[in-house]
Amino acid sequence: MPTIQQLVRKGRTDKISKNKTPALKGSPQRRGVCTRVYTTTPKKPNSALRKVARVRLSSGIEVTAYIPGVGHNLQEHSMVLVRGGRVKDLPGVRYKIVRGSLDTQGVKGRKQARSRYGAKKEK
């Protein structure tokens, strides 16, 4: 507990919150071009082949972005929209690709949580 004199001299410093998506430069999303599309394995207790893409953003920064949903049509030179949001079991993956915008197709045959995966309503 500081004395009043110490508070007069120094004052209290505000906590600085760390930016979790620095590559987006304050934007909600950023456009980018896929430079590499590949699969990775997750951290220890989990086991799978997670689909990820290396994306060069319009801000000039290259990031690793997760491709959510079952199946995708992405390849090198595909234009994608990238949003923030990390994947807990993939170290270094702090961005996700928005399904159903630009060159990314929505998930086929999706019935629930359709808006998250860019899936149109089935008739």
UniProtKB/Swiss-Prot annotation:
The modification 3-methylthioaspartic acid is found at residue 89. It comes from the Bacteria. Residues 108-123 have a biased composition (Basic residues). It holds the Pfam family Ribosom_S12_S23. Keywords: Methylation, Ribonucleoprotein, Ribosomal protein, RNA-binding, rRNA-binding, tRNA-binding. SUPFAM superfamilies: Nucleic acid-binding proteins. The keyword RNA-binding applies. One of its GO terms (cellular component) is small ribosomal subunit. InterPro entries: NA-bd_OB-fold, Ribosomal_uS12, Ribosomal_uS12_bac. Residues 1-32, 103-123 are annotated as: Disordered. One of its GO terms (molecular function) is tRNA binding. Part of the 30S ribosomal subunit. Contacts proteins S8 and S17. May interact with IF1 in the 30S initiation complex. With S4 and S5 plays an important role in translational accuracy. Interacts with and stabilizes bases of the 16S rRNA that are involved in tRNA selection in the A site and with the mRNA backbone. Located at the interface of the 30S and 50S subunits, it traverses the body of the 30S subunit contacting proteins on the other side and probably holding the rRNA structure together. The combined cluster of proteins S8, S12 and S17 appears to hold together the shoulder and platform of the 30S subunit. Belongs to the universal ribosomal protein uS12 family. This is Small ribosomal subunit protein uS12. It comes from Cutibacterium acnes (strain DSM 16379 / KPA171202). The gene is rpsL.
